[in-house]
């Protein structure tokens, strides 16, 4: 059997199993085992039965709807390649729209950037790499409440200035030392409505804690918007991803705080409504106003 024949058979098996990107996945799995790029597969001479046996096994796993990224162990996201696997949300191409927006913004020379619900560290690490490629500095903080996700994030953030904080973004008094200090805040929080029907790769393999955002998908988004109102300095910038059914709800939520201007609904690379951006305006909220922390309250300490 030739490699081309093996890939043809794999693509047919994956298509029969309901994998939309059957041919692409079959080629990527072959390239992964071959240790080469997908475009260089025609130049690869497989070593024999041992290679084809491993290829058959990994294709069978993909046919069982194990995510491609779990089988390969990595995913490309903007300028970086991230380690991913069981227990962490796999970054999606649609989130690169937030990355593109964020990298186009004018920021101070050494901005403070926060990635809330960082997961694998995708946005935080990609923003750090983007600025490093331009010779620019930043202080970047990634926040997540999952130990497993943070294990991946630490691996992905190695060699970057990204700081990781273990904390729950729904905690009302979270990190008050950031109040009024942040120049850019981005977030891809859990936002899928609880009753949504998902593909097997997502439903069976992504952690549910990283997917579902309550009955309407807005529970964690609401908490993140509250944090943005506190943490961003006047003029600070905000972007939050949402389900493609909740764009209007997210715009209304951000606008209703009366703390933001230039609230805009934006689309992902496929043209679907995907995230909302805004600018923090005016004075910082007083204690107890719009989710601000009353100094008489007990200060919450996040485990770093």
From Swiss-Prot:
CDD domains: AdoMet_MTases. GO terms for biological process: methylation. S-adenosyl-L-methionine binds at residues 144, 188. Substrate binds at residues 188-191. One of its GO terms (molecular function) is nucleic acid binding. Its EC number is 2.1.1.297. It catalyses: L-glutaminyl-[peptide chain release factor] + S-adenosyl-L-methionine = N(5)-methyl-L-glutaminyl-[peptide chain release factor] + S-adenosyl-L-homocysteine + H(+). Disulfide bonds: none annotated. InterPro entries: DNA_methylase_N6_adenine_CS, HemK-like, Methyltransf_25, N5-glutamine_MTase, PrmC_N, RF_methyltr_PrmC, SAM-dependent_MTases_sf. Keywords: Methyltransferase, S-adenosyl-L-methionine, Transferase. The keyword Transferase applies. Belongs to the protein N5-glutamine methyltransferase family. PrmC subfamily. Methylates the class 1 translation termination release factors RF1/PrfA and RF2/PrfB on the glutamine residue of the universally conserved GGQ motif. HAMAP family: RF_methyltr_PrmC. This is Release factor glutamine methyltransferase.
